[in-house]
From Swiss-Prot:
F-type ATPases have 2 components, CF(1) - the catalytic core - and CF(0) - the membrane proton channel. CF(1) has five subunits: alpha(3), beta(3), gamma(1), delta(1), epsilon(1). CF(0) has four main subunits: a, b, b' and c. Key component of the proton channel; it plays a direct role in the translocation of protons across the membrane. GO terms for molecular function: proton-transporting ATP synthase activity, rotational mechanism. It comes from Psilotum nudum. The keyword Chloroplast applies. This is ATP synthase subunit a, chloroplastic. InterPro entries: ATP_syn_F0_a_bact/chloroplast, ATP_synth_F0_asu, ATP_synth_F0_asu_AS, F0_ATP_A_sf. It is found in: Plastid, Chloroplast thylakoid membrane.
Length: 248
């Protein structure tokens, strides 16, 4: 009888953990508009962290970098090489800040979800989580990427950019148009799904085996979070490069 009660209690606990309250959000009322405050709060925290890092590491620049300046220059060189590889030697420079901003924001957001216990901060409704754990954030980033590669193509080719939709044959016009909708969808849902799944798995494991299993899973989550940031930035740069070079 005790075993049955224990199993029933365990099942109830798992059901509570797996129940994601998708409709529960914390809103700010601004005039006649409701602003989704949860993702704004955590996004501002990430922005402050990145701004603080930039300020601290660049306030005393030296010809021979040391410490934080050396680290930031290494990150910048990595982002520059990634952008140059995907966009091309001649066109990549103006896009380094955009790709770098995407990569760093997603990277720090993902890691904040794995390292910072957002849920200990109580809200009237819903709960805090990593910015990229919210579909609003990932869709916004994907739409920014879409605007960027449309701008890149139109800026370089003018109205002739739209000729790519009928290449290599006009029969592919519907497919090429559909592709422009699937790109932001795939970017946003891939990032959102991976981060949400990682946080749910860690939460379940912590409830079942609090001390042993969650530690390696957290390291795996950190690795996955870094990879997702790299994938998003790489694909964004690739889409921009493709829009300027034509149909690949």
């Amino acid at each position: 009888m005790n075993i049955e009660k224990h199993l029933i209690s365990l099942i109830n606990d798992l059901c509570q953990i797996s129940g994601v309250e998708v409709g529960q959000h914390f809103y700010w009322q601004l005039g006649g508009f409701q602003v989704h405050a949860q993702v704004l709060i955590t996004s501002w925290v990430v922005i402050v962290l990145l701004s603080g890092l930039a300020f601290v590491t660049t306030r005393d620049l030296r010809t021979i970098p040391t410490g934080g300046q050396n680290f930031v220059e290494y990150v910048l060189e990595f982002i520059r090489d990634l952008t140059r590889t995907q966009i091309g030697e001649e066109e990549y420079r103006p896009w380094v800040p955009f790709i770098g901003t995407l990569f760093l924001f997603i990277f720090v957001s993902n890691w904040s979800g794995a390292l910072f216990p957002w849920k200990i901060i109580q809200l009237p409704h819903g709960e805090l989580a990593a910015p990229t754990n919210d579909i609003n954030t990932t869709v916004a980033l994907a739409l920014l990427t879409s605007v960027a590669y449309f701008y890149a193509g139109l800026h370089k080719k003018g109205l002739s950019y739209f000729g790519r939709y009928i290449k290599p044959t006009p029969i592919l016009l519907p497919i090429n148009i559909l592709e422009d909708f699937t790109k932001p969808l795939s970017l946003s849902f891939r990032l959102f799904g991976n981060i949400l799944a990682d946080e749910l798995v860690v939460a379940v494991l912590i409830s079942l085996v609090p001390l042993v299993v969650p530690i390696p899973m957290m390291f795996l989550g950190l690795f996955t979070s870094a990879i997702q940031a790299l994938i998003f930035a790489t694909l964004a740069a690739a889409y921009i490069g493709e829009s300027m070079e034509g149909h690949h």
